[in-house]
């Protein structure tokens, strides 16, 4: 089983993550071990840069999977999710660029665009140009402001190529952080849910932001929330809290 160890931080000491994934079952996965029905029934195939950076074998398998799912009509979603403990920015860029022509939805932070891909200018122009170069349908970029280890602001911006339109909303401010691990994945899950269920980038952004904000308040790296709570948080964010307790 692949695991990781997380050491909580406190300013000025940053949190630390140590990966232990060598010789895990995932590392030995082969393409022919996946039933053919999985490829034809999948609507969105999502993968991240962490997977590409684990090993050469998994890197190659991931590329095969992307091609296979793409050929079967799935939307390909990719989160850069750069981790310097796995590889350098240059190594990551070289490998990620290889798969971008097959990607439909890209998740990347503004820092990633500027540091890894060496892009300059306004983030909106960067996202628009990136979508044009690689024929990306949608690009999402999150923004996190760290007030302290226990107080964050979170927002995002989405660019939809077919409409040449950007979507954003007011940030979730002063989130009381219990555990930030997994909040990026929660954001991605919210956005992809919005795309799958609503086929609406603006609604997808709201689901993503709310999911990420909620995950910061939950211990562990899994977002244990339901759609009712998610919609309540979105409504309160847009119209203000109605009460201090839900009961």
PLM region spans:
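A short helix->loop->beta-strand "cap" motif at the edges of active sites that frequently abuts
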Residues: 68-75, 133-137
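Active-site beta-loop-alpha junctions enriched in small/polar residues
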Residues: 22, 50, 81-85, 111, ...
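Conserved post-catalytic alpha-helical subdomain immediately downstream of the catalytic base
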Residues: 167, 171-247
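Conserved phosphate/ATP/ADP-binding segment of small-molecule kinases
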Residues: 86-163
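Catalytic-core regions built around general acid/base machinery
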Residues: 61-73, 95-102
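Hydrophobic faces of well-ordered beta-strands that scaffold small-molecule active sites
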Residues: 76-78, 106
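Conserved N-terminal subdomain of the carbohydrate kinase-like
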Residues: 1-49, 231-247
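Glycine/threonine-rich flexible loop motifs
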Residues: 51-60, 88, 116-119
């Amino acid at each position: 089983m692949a695991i990781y160890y997380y050491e909580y931080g406190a300013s000025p000491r940053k949190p630390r993550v140590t990966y232990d994934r060598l010789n895990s079952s995932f590392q030995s996965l082969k393409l022919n071990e996946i039933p053919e029905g999985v490829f034809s029934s999948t609507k969105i195939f999502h993968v991240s840069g962490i997977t590409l950076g684990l090993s050469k074998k998994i890197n190659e398998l991931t590329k095969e999977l992307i091609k296979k799912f793409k050929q079967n009509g799935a939307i390909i979603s990719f989160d850069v999710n750069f981790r310097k403990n796995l590889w350098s920015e240059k190594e990551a860029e070289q490998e990620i660029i290889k798969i971008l022509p097959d990607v439909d939805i890209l998740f990347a932070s503004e820092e990633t665009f500027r540091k890894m891909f060496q892009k300059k200018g306004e983030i909106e122009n960067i996202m628009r140009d990136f979508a044009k170069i690689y024929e990306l349908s949608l690009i999402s970029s999150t923004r996190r402001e760290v007030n302290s280890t226990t107080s964050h602001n979170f927002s995002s911006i989405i660019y939809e190529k077919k409409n040449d339109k950007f979507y954003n909303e007011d940030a979730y401010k002063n989130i009381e952080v219990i555990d930030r691990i997994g909040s990026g994945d929660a954001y991605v899950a919210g956005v992809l849910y919005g795309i799958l269920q609503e086929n609406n980038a603006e609604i997808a952004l709201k689901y993503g932001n709310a999911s990420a904000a909620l995950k910061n308040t939950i211990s562990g790296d899994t977002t244990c929330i339901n759609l009712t709570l998610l919609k309540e948080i979105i409504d309160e964010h847009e119209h203000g809290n109605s009460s201090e307790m839900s009961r």
